[in-house]
Amino acid sequence: LRLLILMLFIITSAVTQAQTYEAGLVLGGTNFVGDVGSSSFTNPSDYAKKDKFSYGAIFKWNRSPRHAFRFSIIQHRTFGYDHLSESIGRQKRGYEFKNSLTEFSVGLEFNFWEWNLHDFKRPQFVPYVSTGLNFFIADHLGPNEPEKELVKIDENYNFAIPLIFGIKGAVSERFVIALEFGARYAFTDNLDGSNPQESIEIDEIVSFGNQNMNDWYIFGGVTLTYTFGRKPCYCKF
């Protein structure tokens, strides 16, 4: 929560008089795809039951009607339960984990057609795609065999590549709402505790699952942003 407040303070105090900016909040759910739990890319019913919402703050710098720089901090809360898996083998194994990822993201957002916040003579709805680079801090997990639970043994500092699709619309002269779905390919195979020896050599802990594939985490949610800055004179990049 402190990170979100700090980010909102920085981006709202950095206003210049040349471009149009957006700053706001993010709320949704984060699904995990790896070696523990369900392999479904979306599982909204589970998040409603487990109350594992993800939240964060986002800032966009609209550099032209077709693209923007975007920066975000999101606290992803995810989990996996083998008994919810479609795999009989996983159901019999019975592992479970919970993990929390603090994600710092920088990227580019491309609009499918021109997005002009200052033109309200026509409906302002546009689909978009975004990618970039994420850095995250998560728990480095390992198995606690008697309890069949994967628990924290260290910190996991790593990167991920996001691919995000969304649609956004201006609901007033100052507010924009967006729905987006984004998959993150992580540069680690241990968000679920299946490969604890990835960065730590522990003789008594054995890795399991597919060691040739890294983990994914998938976020789906809504953003609400407030726009500020005068009507822009767009640059050439």
Regions found by a protein language model. Name each.
Residues 61, 65-144, 228:
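Gram-negative (and chloroplast) outer-membrane scaffold detector with strong preference
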Residues 35-41, 81-88, 120-122, 140-148, ...:
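Outer-membrane beta-barrel translocator domains and adjoining extracellular loop/strand segments
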Residues 17-60, 140, 219-231, 237:
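Short glycine/proline- and aromatic-enriched beta-strand/turn motifs that initiate or cap beta-hairpins
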Residues 19, 49-53, 100-104, 125, ...:
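Residues that define the transmembrane beta-barrel architecture of outer-membrane proteins
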Residues 40-47, 90-97, 147-153, 207-210:
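Extracellular loop and loop/strand-boundary signature of outer-membrane beta-barrel proteins
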Residues 19-23, 65-69, 100-102, 123-127, ...:
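Outer-envelope beta-barrel architecture signal
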Residues 171-237:
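Predominantly the C-terminal beta-signal and adjacent terminal strand-loop region
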Residues 25-29, 57-61, 106-110, 131-135, ...:
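Residues on the lipid-exposed face of transmembrane beta-strands in outer-membrane beta-barrel proteins
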